[in-house]
């Protein structure tokens, strides 16, 4: 069989794994790349390559070797200038090289949103040294949030509540940085009512949206998500307006995870990822088309006739608590048995080869067909608590 398309996937984590499954169901041939062998997406891909995405020569060599129809980034730390070179030669970078460059760096996408598009954001400043960060914190005020301009899954992110905490926050940010840009963004803390992810799909036929996803974070990383999340119709429309403005400015086709803070009637842009979002894993059970299906269809130019919600749904993460390369996952059978009637449960184990504290090793999914979002959240959390990692 001749594949419908060849995809070079740059980054092979759990989000990439689900994307590979969706793309292969549509006939694509996928080459999964990452810095270590046996990464989750590699286990289900057609081929695999192991190299650092920050090695420009190795990245170019992989592109030259496989000659993909689409280059699909799944991680933040990539030599984006190499992607721009190949896009200029006629290759398709998803969603576009410009979008990848802008969104892989928090400062650049913030400038697009705040300066170019005039969208509401928190007050912010940048710092490249400890002294600059002390000055930025003094000007922004405390409490404030410090994030590396390039990182993932909340790494390096912390809340500074007083001037005494600045030095430790700088060290933590530097330790959590990806890439080679030693720069942080210092944001005024917003006492928001809640935060959401609006999955926004840019297709050749226009922009479509999933229902807003609520989520809870710890240490800057998602712990649980749910869909739908209660919002006023006005707030939903404002989030859609902002999301469409940003993705249309970035261009290209694919799914974007657009994050917002909501405070009263105010909808405030936070961040954007040009790919499936971790909080969007709830769509594996909540929708007829998951975020991974939607990303694959948008990339391949396939139609998305409708996005249907099955009912109140939730996801909860399964985390490791120590470093190990020899471990087992127990309790999956117990996790799949609901404690209440009317609940559907599922589990995704990511098959990562090693653990470390707080590393995401799996996720539980719950659908409350005749219940509430709170019922789904409780079921997902209860299921996650039953899955245990046993270290040998």
Question: Where are the language model's segments positioned?
Answer:
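Peripheral (often C-terminal) accessory segments that flank ATP-dependent C-N-forming ligase machineries
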Residues: 297-392
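ATP-binding N-terminal substructure of ATP-dependent carboxylate-amine bond-forming enzymes
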Residues: 1-104, 131, 391
């Amino acid at each position: 069989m001749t594949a419908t398309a060849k995809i070079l996937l740059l980054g092979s984590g759990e989000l990439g794994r689900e994307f590979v499954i969706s793309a292969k169901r549509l006939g694509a041939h996928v080459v999964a790349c990452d810095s270590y062998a046996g990464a989750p997406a590699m286990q289900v891909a057609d081929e695999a390559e192991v190299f650092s995405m920050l090695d420009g020569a190795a990245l170019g060599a992989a592109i030259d070797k496989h000659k993909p129809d689409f280059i699909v980034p799944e991680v933040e730390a990539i030599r984006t200038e190499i992607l721009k070179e190949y896009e200029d030669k006629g290759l398709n970078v998803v969603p576009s090289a410009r979008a990848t460059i802008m969104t892989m760096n928090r400062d650049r996408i913030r400038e697009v949103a705040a300066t170019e598009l005039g969208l509401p954001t928190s007050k912010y400043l940048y710092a490249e040294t400890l002294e600059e960060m002390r000055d930025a914190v003094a000007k922004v005020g405390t409490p404030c949030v410090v994030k590396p301009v390039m990182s993932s899954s909340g790494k390096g992110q912390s809340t500074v509540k007083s001037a005494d905490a600045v030095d430790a926050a700088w060290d933590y940010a530097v330790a959590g940085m990806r890439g080679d840009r030693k720069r942080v963004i210092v944001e005024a803390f917003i006492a928001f009512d809640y935060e959401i992810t609006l999955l926004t799909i840019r297709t050749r036929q226009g922009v479509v949206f999933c229902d807003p996803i609520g989520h809870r974070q710890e240490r800057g990383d998602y712990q649980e998500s749910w869909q739908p999340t209660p919002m006023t119709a006005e707030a939903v429309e404002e989030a859609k307006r902002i999301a469409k403005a940003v993705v249309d400015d970035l261009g290209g086709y694919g799914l974007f995870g657009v994050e917002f803070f909501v405070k009263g009637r105010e909808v405030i842009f936070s961040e954007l990822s040009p790919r499936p979002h971790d909080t969007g894993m709830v769509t594996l059970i909540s929708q007829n088309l998951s975020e991974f299906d939607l990303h694959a269809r948008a990339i391949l130019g396939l139609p998305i006739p409708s996005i249907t919600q099955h009912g109140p749904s939730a996801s909860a993460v399964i985390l490791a608590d120590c470093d190990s390369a020899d471990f087992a996952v127990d309790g999956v059978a117990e996790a799949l048995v609901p404690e209440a009637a009317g609940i559907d449960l599922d589990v995704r184990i990511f098959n990562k080869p090693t653990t470390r504290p707080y590393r995401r090793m799996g996720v539980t999914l719950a659908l409350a067909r005749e219940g509430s979002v709170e019922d789904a959240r409780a079921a997902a959390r209860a299921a996650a608590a039953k899955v245990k990692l046993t270290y040998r």
